[in-house]
């Protein structure tokens, strides 16, 4: 799974 925060 991948987590992206911007």
Swiss-Prot record:
<keyword id="KW-0328">Glycosyltransferase</keyword>
<keyword id="KW-0808">Transferase</keyword>
<dbReference type="GO" id="GO:0047849">
    <property type="term" value="F:dextransucrase activity"/>
</dbReference>
<protein>
    <recommendedName>
        <fullName>Dextransucrase</fullName>
        <ecNumber>2.4.1.5</ecNumber>
    </recommendedName>
</protein>
<comment type="similarity">
    <text>Belongs to the glycosyl hydrolase 70 family.</text>
</comment>
<comment type="function">
    <text>Involved in the production of dextran, an extracellular glucan polymer.</text>
</comment>
